[in-house]
Amino acid sequence: MSKIRVVHYINQFFAGVGGEEKADIEPFIAESLPPVSQSLSNLIKDEAEVVGTVVCGDSYFGENLVEAKNRILEMIKSFNPDIVVAGPAFNAGRYGVAAATVTKAVQDELGIPAVTGMYIENPGADMFKKYAYIISTGNSAAAMRTALPAMAKFAMKLAKGEEIGGPVAEGYIERGIRFNMFKEDRGAKRAVAMLVKKLKGEEYETEYPMPSFDKVEPGKAIKDMSKAKIAIVTSGGIVPKGNPDRIESSSASKYGKYDIQGIDDLTSEGWETAHGGHDPIYANEDADRVIPVDVLRDMEKEGVIGELHRYFYSTTGNGTAVASSKKFAEEFTKELVADGVDAVILTSTUGTCTRCGASMVKEIERSGIPVVHIATVTPISLTVGANRIVPAIAIPHPLGNPALSHEEEKALRRKIVEKALEALQTEVEEQTVFERNY
């Protein structure tokens, strides 16, 4: 009997190509199995083999979703696999979204079973858990020794068409799908047993867990932008040179509040990024590529907006827990309200950074202040629940393009900000991604 054919999808880091400096690499087939693919092959060697590894840079995938997916599918198809394994992505947001997108597409478009793995707080998990099997892993590559065997075991079960049990038994993230199953005891007996456990204060597990919905009403549109006070918030980690508050480069435990009164431009002499989730060179060269102080200051002088708030709030969103993101926003939103801020422009960079940003968007908007989220990976913003979303240019430079001249780049940034102001002046009843014209 021939062995089960497995294709492995991984990002540039696990392929050994490089880190953030290679995150824009286009899809390709590895000439030989990278170590992680070889480890997977060793785990399943008795009944299967990894016949090929397909690689794509995280940023390239995030910025070219449709094209990247289609090219990767063609590469996978060329191996004629029986199953596809993607990842594990742990808590790497862009990687998680890419791995889950590939997993779903392989199932839906190629008709081939597929599985991926990631940390439960990875934005890819929230986006795709209803559509794909996602094995729950630790939040970093330190968990590889447990994650890969769990994925390998599940993949073999899936490839052989064996019955798949519930999420607790099989180790995948709960999908919110109900299915019939047979139990030895009647429902009445199980219900009484559960009630007794509850009354005793013992742990029990419901058989019908309810999904959690957390949507926020969109803030009312700004009627007269020429009189509005606009504040900037970012999960992109822009801080004064030297990072005086020591905001962590990942999994931030704090945020900063910075005074920009009298500042027309965020130069490299005074500002930098503390963000560790993408190549920092572009933001360090010009922090306006992440928060558009220069353009908003021009608009303030021209009377397009009433006032740019003298403070902006910043944290690093990559790997930052949703609970922390909410806590930060709950705290500084009180100050925004007290300071009479009318609207907020919030910017984000990478995948988990976008999740953090969108989480802050919702907390700010609970106060009634309308917020527009400028982000490159817009599907994550939608999944988390931001109401007004404006597409950005690229993950490391959402409001800029280093390939342009200074004047051209600033003109591009102005178009993005104009679109953001348009969004803030538009009444919306549901989540809306405003079409880019730049």
Swiss-Prot record:
Catalytic activity of the protein: acetyl phosphate + [thioredoxin]-disulfide + NH4(+) + H2O = [thioredoxin]-dithiol + glycine + phosphate + H(+)
Annotated family: Belongs to the GrdB/GrdF/GrdH family.
Protein name: Glycine reductase complex component B subunit gamma
Stored NCBIfam families: gly_red_sel_B (TIGR01917), various_sel_PB (TIGR01918)
Gene label: grdB
Subunit structure, as described in the record: Heterohexamer of two alpha, two beta and two gamma subunits. Component of the glycine reductase complex, together with components A and C. PB is substrate specific.
PROSITE patterns (UniProt xref): EPSP_SYNTHASE_1
Source species, domain of life: Bacteria
One Pfam family from the record: GRDB
Gene Ontology molecular function, alphabetical: glycine reductase activity
Organism: Peptoclostridium acidaminophilum
Uppermost EC category: oxidoreductase
Annotated S-S bridges: none
A GO CC annotation given for this chain: glycine reductase complex
Keywords for this protein: Oxidoreductase, Selenocysteine
Biological role stated in the UniProt entry: In the first step of glycine reductase, the substrate is bound to component PB via a Schiff base intermediate. Then the PB-activated substrate is nucleophilically attacked by the selenol anion of component PA to transform it to a carboxymethylated selenoether and the respective amine. By action of component PC, acetyl phosphate is formed, leaving component PA in its oxidized state. Finally component PA becomes reduced by the thioredoxin system to start a new catalytic cycle of reductive deamination.
Active-site residue list: U350
EC number in record: 1.21.4.2
